[in-house]
Amino acid sequence: MGLDMYLYGVKQEFHKHDYNIGGYKESTEIGYWRKANAVHAWFVECCQNGVDNCATYYVGHEDLKALRDRCEDVLLEPERAEELLPTQDGFFFGTTEYDDWYFDDIKETIEICKWALAQDFDYFEYHSSW
């Protein structure tokens, strides 16, 4: 058990000529974190309106850019990590220390965001469970 976090890239297609058919949504898992509670706290605050309920939430391109930028700021000023991207405690959420594990999660988040933003997804979705 523990905090598992997923980012999905979504392509959405609508049938323009037959509105009775609607369309489809294709989701692809493009990011996974385990117990990266600071990143999870950012998604809860910025994309989930503060609601932490293991549901799936919309994430826009601008949201991912903001997360990427915040993580880059943390790496540039690690002494401000607690202010810029604070950890979050919780049952099964892992450590709240600003240690090598924390900074590895930050680096991984930057890579996930960069890759995701370079793709042709219409939007993204974030889901967590514990």
Tell me what each language-model feature is.
Residues M1-W130:
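Acidic (Asp/Glu-rich) sequence patches and key acidic residues
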